Design a protein with these regions (language model features):
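Conserved short histidine dyad/triad with adjacent acidic residue
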Residues: 22-23, 36-52
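A cytosolic small-molecule/anion-sensing beta-strand core signal
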Residues: 33, 61-62, 79-80, 98
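Short, conserved beta-strand element in jelly-roll/cupin
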Residues: 41-42, 51-71, 105
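Amphipathic, hydrophobic secondary-structure cores in small proteins
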Residues: 47-53, 58, 80-85
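Ligand-binding loop in jelly-roll beta-barrel domains
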Residues: 88-116
Length: 125
């Protein structure tokens, strides 16, 4: 995904998220060294997946965001101004029971479709 913003450009997350009408949206905002910051606007459930080489950090701007951790058998619930990191190799899925805006900080190598091959968007049932 190409970055929407370069260095020395103002990024207004609230304005960007407010313009999103889709139930599932993912945009790379900018690149910082070998990492990217992505904006996610979502409602629904993403499929189970893991990243072999990359860690991820999720930060909630608005809404409610759930991260299910398969091996631990637990769910982490995040509300605005809370964040959580998922280390490489951990099988997880994310859920947003209501419209939720998040920022994701991850390696530029992370494929935002999970393990790859799946469509970007909520899990299919």
């Amino acid at each position: 995904m190409d970055e929407a913003f370069g260095f020395l450009e103002l990024v207004d997350v609230q304005e960007l998220a407010g313009a999103v009408e889709d139930r599932w949206y993912n945009q790379t905002l900018c690149r910082i060294n070998d990492c990217v910051v992505r904006l996610g606007v979502m409602q629904g459930e993403f499929h189970w997946h893991h990243h072999d080489e990359e860690d991820e950090f999720f930060y909630v701007v608005e809404g409610r965001f759930l991260i299910d951790l398969q091996e631990e058998g637990r769910t982490v619930e995040l509300t605005p101004r809370q964040g959580f990191s998922v280390p490489r190799g951990v099988v997880h899925r994310t859920r947003a029971p209501e419209r939720t805006v998040i920022l994701m900080f991850e390696s530029a190598g992370v494929v935002p479709t999970g393990d790859g091959g799946n469509e970007l968007g909520p899990a299919r049932r």
